[in-house]
Amino acid sequence: MEQTLDIKANKVKETVGRHVLADGFDFVMDIEKSHGSWLYDKQTDREYLDMFSMFASASVGYNHPYLVERSEWLGKMAVNKPTLADVYSEEYAHFLEVFERVVIPEELQYAFFIEGGTLGVENAMKACFDWKTRKNFEKGLQTEAGICIHFKQAFHGRSGYTLSLTNTSDPRKYQYFPMFNWPRILNPKLKFPITEDNLEETIKNENLALVQIEEAILMNPDKVACIIIEPIQAEGGDNHFRDEFLLGLRRICDDNEILLIFDEVQTGIGITGKMWAFQHFTAKPDIISFGKKAQVCGVLANKEKFDQIPNNVFRESSRINSTFGGNFIDMLRFQLVMEVIEKENLVENARVVGDFLLESLKALAEKYPEKISNARGRGLMCAVDLPSAAQRNHLMNELFNDGLIILPCGDQSL
C-alpha cells in the first residue's frame, strides 16, 4: 500500500527542526523526481546539478533504472534486519559473491562489515593494535601497542579512536572531546602544477615527514601499531601524495613490523578512476577502511599478513563485531550498485570523464590565475583553490543560486 505523506514541502524543515538541528541545504528533496545527477527541490520545482553526491556516497546517482527495476525485491528484503554476524542467508551469500567479484582486490581477502565509515576506520585500527600487541608477546615483550601515527589535515571520523586522528580546518568536529596524544605528522602534499620549485618543496617535506615518523617510533618502542593515511586527503583539502612518499611509509612499516592503513572511505568505489585509490600507487596497504559509496562500511585486510598471528581479529570470534554485522539492506542496495558499475563500466568512465574535468579546471586556472589555482584530481575526485575561504564560500553560494551543489574542503578549496 502506498504511503500518503501529509507534510507539505514548506513545512518539512520546520517539522524536522522541532527535534533535530535542521541547518542543512535550503531545499526539500523530492525522492521520486530526483534522477541521475539531478536533485529535485519540492519547494520550488527546481532541479540542482549534484556535484556533492550526498557527501561522496551516492554511487550511481538517483533512481537509476536498474535499482528502480529491482525496488520491489529490495523493499521486500527491507522488512527484516538480520544480525549478519551470526545469522546467514542466501541473499547475504550472493551479495558476498558479487562483492568478491567486483570490489575485493587480490591482496585484501579478509573482510569485515559494520555500519558507519568511522567504525570501519576504528575497527581497522583495532585489528592493527591486536596484531602488533600479539607480535610483541611472541617476542617475549609485555608491551601493548596502542599508538596510531597519522597526518595533519586528516579526517578519519568523529568518534572513538578516530577523534584522535581528525584535525581538519573545522575544529567543531573534534574540539573539547577527549583524545589520545598520538604522533601527528606533517602531510607532504603536492602543489599543482608540479613545477621544479613545487616538487623540490614537496620532496623536502616528504623527507621531513619520514624523519618525524621514525623519531615517533624511536620514542615509543614497540608501541606503534599502525600508520594511517587517506590516499587523497578529502575533507582536509583534496591533498595528493607522491608514490615515492607512500613507498617510504611502506618501507618504515616493513622495517618496524607496523601495519599500514589506507582510509578509503571517501576515495574508494571507483571515483578516482580505479576501484580503490591505492591501486594508482606502487605502495600497497595492509588494511583499508571503506564506506560511503559502498553503502555498507567495513574493512578489507591482507590475509597473509594478518595470518602471521593465528588468532588475529579476523579468525577469533567476537574480537571485532557488532549486532548487525553491517547493514543487510545497504549490502543488497550495494549489490545492485556493483552490478551497475560492472555492466556500465563506470570505473573507466570515471577515469575518462575525470580527465576531461581536470583538463577543464586547469584551463580555468590558466585563464583566471588570480582567482583559481592548484587544479588537481584523480578521476572525478577533483578540486581547485580560491584565494581565500571567503571567496571560496562566495563562489559556492553563487553556484548554488545558479542550480549547482558543490562542497568546500580544506581552508580554501572547492
Give residue ranges: language-model regions.
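Conserved N-terminal phosphate-binding loop of PLP-dependent enzymes in the Aspartate aminotransferase
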Residues: M1-L414
